[in-house]
Amino acid sequence: MTALYWEDIQIGTRRDLGGYTFSEAEIIRFAKKYDPQVFHVDPEAAKQSIFGGLIASGWHTAAVWMKLSLAEREASKGTTPLMRAGVSPGFEDMRWIKPVRPGMTLRFSSEVCGKQELRSRPELGL
């Protein structure tokens, strides 16, 4: 696998991670385990919620992004130079703009929006 070095990383570089369709059963299964709010777990009760129906947990959509990101990275090994992956420093601005309903397909991507050197770990950057 060819490594991608700090100076090679270009702001604006975008990677398509593919699409994912959220099924009702999967939305309910995820939410029952991790985010059991009524509008995620009960289609009938969800009709009375502010969303007017069942929606996926935002954490479900984030988990799907992570799954697709790792799958795309694995599929790219040996064919595309990759950035070294490490522990995430967290998120500053994660928002869920629109509800994700059963049957919806979302397309996911990642984009390099900036770069930051780490003084404490000169071999790494964000």
Predicted regions: what is each one?
Residues 87, 91-126:
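Hydrophobic beta-sheet segments that form the core/acyl-binding groove
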Residues 1-89:
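Hot-dog-fold acyl-thioester-processing enzymes
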